């Protein structure tokens, strides 16, 4: 009896699925996009019926996707990839840079699952990052690292009294979370 790979089924006669790996990706739009949604919702005006941004409407630009590593002796470092729309479309016509970078991680996870079918459920940091990055690399564009002197307190405008720790800018109390 054949079953879809890598689903694991019980050994009894009913053959029910006891393990079926899944991938999940969560994305949060940038602050300007969220602000735009709030403005539309709060305006009291009905939004247009529908507008889907087509691939042809994206004529230039790119995406910087990375992580800010902070709180160490050198302050903070942004590490990530920069992919232009032209580079993305050279890899896959009608695609965009953000989609290419993001789905490269999903592709890497799927390859890892296919190559490690008996590992069961694992956290992302338990996967072989070297192998995953090798799968992702063609879809990431330029990989860059940049140090910065930015801190959560650098450009803060305190219009109202707030708790903050001026002795260590990297304390959680200094971050504004919404």
Where are these regions (language model features)?
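C-terminal catalytic/substrate-binding lobe primarily of soluble NAD(P)-dependent oxidoreductases
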Residues: 1-2, 8-178
């Amino acid at each position: 009896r054949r079953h879809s790979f890598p689903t694991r089924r019980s050994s009894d006669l009913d053959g029910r699925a006891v393990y079926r790996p899944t991938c999940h990706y969560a994305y949060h739009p940038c602050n300007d996009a969220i602000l735009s949604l709030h403005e539309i919702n709060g305006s009291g005006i009905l939004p247009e019926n529908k507008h889907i941004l087509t691939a042809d409407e994206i004529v230039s630009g790119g995406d910087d996707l990375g992580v800010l590593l902070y709180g160490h002796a050198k302050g903070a470092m942004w590490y990530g990839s920069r992919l232009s729309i032209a580079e993305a479309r050279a890899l896959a016509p009608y695609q965009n840079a953000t989609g290419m970078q993001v789905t490269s991680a999903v592709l890497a996870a799927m390859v890892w699952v296919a190559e490690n079918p008996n590992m069961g459920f694992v956290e992302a940091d338990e996967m072989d990052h070297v192998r995953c990055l090798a799968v992702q690399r063609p879809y990431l564009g330029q990989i860059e690292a940049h140090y910065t002197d930015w801190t959560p307190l650098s450009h803060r405008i305190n219009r109202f009294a707030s708790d903050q720790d001026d002795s260590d800018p990297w304390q959680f109390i200094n971050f504004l979370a919404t």
